[in-house]
Design a protein with these regions (language model features):
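Extracellular jelly-roll beta-sandwich "head" domains, especially the C-terminal globular C1q domain
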Residues: 1-130
Length: 130
């Protein structure tokens, strides 16, 4: 799947709902919840590239209610910045993966508009053979 934000995110500590769908043919990403649902066990690659504007940002990638990757970017006044992260994860059927802003509202500079994108992508590299 490959998805993006359509507007600035304002709510911390809940899954970010990426509603701009670039690719989601198998429908394993649910835009209403912001979560990827694993239907095929195996090794997955996830990445995110976020635009930072107006505030610092703290973003976590979660697997099954546990943060496994953290990204922090400090906003530089009057500039748009970028931050990114990527990880390989082994998933079982039923596992869920998502991104969320963590902390308080002071660290919620995650941004998107018609010329600045924030994206989240994931795909299966190898399925389990046993």
């Amino acid at each position: 799947f490959s998805v993006g934000l359509e507007t600035r995110v304002t709510v911390p500590n809940v899954p970010i709902r990426f509603t701009k769908i670039f690719y989601n043919q198998q429908n394993h990403y649910d835009g209403s919840t912001g979560k990827f649902y694993c239907n095929i066990p195996g090794l997955y690659y996830f990445s995110y590239h976020i635009t930072v504007y107006m505030k610092d940002v703290k973003v976590s990638l979660f697997k099954k209610d546990k943060a496994v990757l953290f990204t922090y970017d400090q906003y530089q006044e009057k500039n748009v910045d970028q931050a990114s992260g990527s990880v390989l994860l082994h998933l079982e059927v039923g596992d869920q993966v998502w991104l969320q802003v963590y902390g308080d509202g002071d660290h919620n500079g995650l941004y998107a508009d018609n010329v600045n994108d924030s994206t989240f992508t994931g795909f299966l590299l190898y399925h389990d053979t046993n």
